[in-house]
Amino acid sequence: MIGRLRGILAYKQPPWLVIDVGGVGYELEAPMSTFYDLPDVGRDVILFTHYAQKEDSVSLYGFLREGERRLFRDVQKVTGIGAKIALAVLSGVTVDEFARLITSGDITALTRIPGIGKKTAERMVVELRDRAADFSSGAPITGQLGPDAVSEATVALQQLGYKPAEAARMAREAGAEGDEVATVIRKALQAALR
């Protein structure tokens, strides 16, 4: 319906903002990740949008980055999750952090996001694990070995085409204390060729 808006930012007060496009003010709801990077009121802005129509309401959601909109849509495909929790996810963690949490199955960290309990977090991991690599923005892979380094290596291996479980196993087995993420990935790929 409405995939993108380009106009002047007329109003911003979390979670709402208004964009003036040719004299028409579009009211959108947006996650905090979008609010952090919005320009000042009166400046030009381009937002990716998601249009949602229910029996009794019509809503428009705005995102500065396409990856955020994609994550917003995919999270809502999980049984029992709607726009409110999807916005909470994007307000609580970055897209890359969410991909790592899903890939590593970190239920505890997911339950720290408002509105997500243990059962919902478990359901998210099960239903989104195969798509987690699609969430990642492809940020540079750096850092020391640890839970985040293993998760980053796992995501990178998934982006290379490995199944989530196989990528996680490869990253765990290849990592040694003190290795950088790039080294873990290289060792995992070398081991896969043997």
Curated annotation (Swiss-Prot):
Has three domains with a flexible linker between the domains II and III and assumes an 'L' shape. Domain III is highly mobile and contacts RuvB. GO terms for cellular component: cytoplasm; Holliday junction helicase complex; Holliday junction resolvase complex. One of its GO terms (biological process) is SOS response. It holds the Pfam family HHH_5. Belongs to the RuvA family. Residues 1-64 are annotated as: Domain I. Gene3D superfamilies: 5' to 3' exonuclease, C-terminal subdomain, DNA helicase RuvA subunit, C-terminal domain, Nucleic acid-binding proteins. HAMAP family: DNA_HJ_migration_RuvA. Signal peptide: none annotated. The keyword DNA repair applies. Residues 65-140 are annotated as: Domain II. Homotetramer. Forms an RuvA(8)-RuvB(12)-Holliday junction (HJ) complex. HJ DNA is sandwiched between 2 RuvA tetramers; dsDNA enters through RuvA and exits via RuvB. An RuvB hexamer assembles on each DNA strand where it exits the tetramer. Each RuvB hexamer is contacted by two RuvA subunits (via domain III) on 2 adjacent RuvB subunits; this complex drives branch migration. In the full resolvosome a probable DNA-RuvA(4)-RuvB(12)-RuvC(2) complex forms which resolves the HJ. The keyword Phosphoprotein does not apply. Keywords: Cytoplasm, DNA damage, DNA recombination, DNA repair, DNA-binding. SUPFAM superfamilies: DNA helicase RuvA subunit, C-terminal domain (SSF46929), Nucleic acid-binding proteins (SSF50249), RuvA domain 2-like (SSF47781). Residues 140-144 are annotated as: Flexible linker. This is Holliday junction branch migration complex subunit RuvA. The gene is ruvA. Residues 145-194 are annotated as: Domain III.
